[in-house]
């Protein structure tokens, strides 16, 4: 099984969730073993997508250094993971990726337009060899060894609309597109004023966010799935785990997880060399793992 990049360059435009300004995005092919690289054209600055380059996880996953930052990368990273793309350059002319409709389906459409190209290098995956867990009170995220990688996610909100929701996701591109990619980000009406006073969520609207009041959803079209909230959390988690640089072959289990806990989990994994193995998918090894790329 070979590494993949894009067959051609594709461009798009969307609104930034936090600044509320139009953002141009370009996805470009990259050579083998390059990974996922973000480039801010307005700063002439590149940022490799990796845990060590994460500088903030408060409202989104943010890459950066003393030159600047790129925020809200997780939805795009999630789509890239689902499509099995190993090497891509993402060019942005602003400090965040566009939010599009609040899900990753627009990025999936861009990747469909670009197509994929095999490179002359074997695909590599990260196989989890022993359990790794991060906790914050009763909240936790965990990776464990498995023969069939999946995500088991539970959320619990003190809100009548959301309440407690659980979802089990088995990795495949088809399953992702049908059941995860269209799940939108969400927020609470009571938090809007505070966020905007911090210059956050300035681009948030009913066009790109599920807005929840005490006992109702403000979006006139309603939900895309009855459990859209937890499905979106899975979308986010896939994007955050992609920062490890490989498709992760392990069970991810979360209770009330977050970008912050996901980031701590990726750091914990990398800290313990016995917790994982990087497997090169040559002809002799790929059969055991190829289902996850179907």
UniProtKB/Swiss-Prot annotation:
Zn(2+) binds at residues 75, 232, 236. Gene3D superfamilies: lpxc deacetylase, domain 1 (3.30.230.20), lpxc deacetylase, domain 2 (3.30.1700.10). Its EC number is 3.5.1.108. Belongs to the LpxC family. One of its GO terms (cellular component) is membrane. The active site is at 259 (proton donor). One of its GO terms (molecular function) is UDP-3-O-acyl-N-acetylglucosamine deacetylase activity. Its cofactor is Zn(2+). This is UDP-3-O-acyl-N-acetylglucosamine deacetylase. Pathway: Glycolipid biosynthesis; lipid IV(A) biosynthesis; lipid IV(A) from (3R)-3-hydroxytetradecanoyl-[acyl-carrier-protein] and UDP-N-acetyl-alpha-D-glucosamine: step 2/6. Catalyzes the hydrolysis of UDP-3-O-myristoyl-N-acetylglucosamine to form UDP-3-O-myristoylglucosamine and acetate, the committed step in lipid A biosynthesis. Keywords: Hydrolase, Lipid A biosynthesis, Lipid biosynthesis, Lipid metabolism, Metal-binding, Zinc. It is an enzyme of class 3 (hydrolase). GO terms for biological process: lipid A biosynthetic process. It catalyses: a UDP-3-O-[(3R)-3-hydroxyacyl]-N-acetyl-alpha-D-glucosamine + H2O = a UDP-3-O-[(3R)-3-hydroxyacyl]-alpha-D-glucosamine + acetate. InterPro entries: Ribosomal_Su5_D2-typ_SF, UDP-acyl_GlcNac_deAcase, UDP-acyl_GlcNac_deAcase_C, UDP-acyl_N-AcGlcN_deAcase_N.
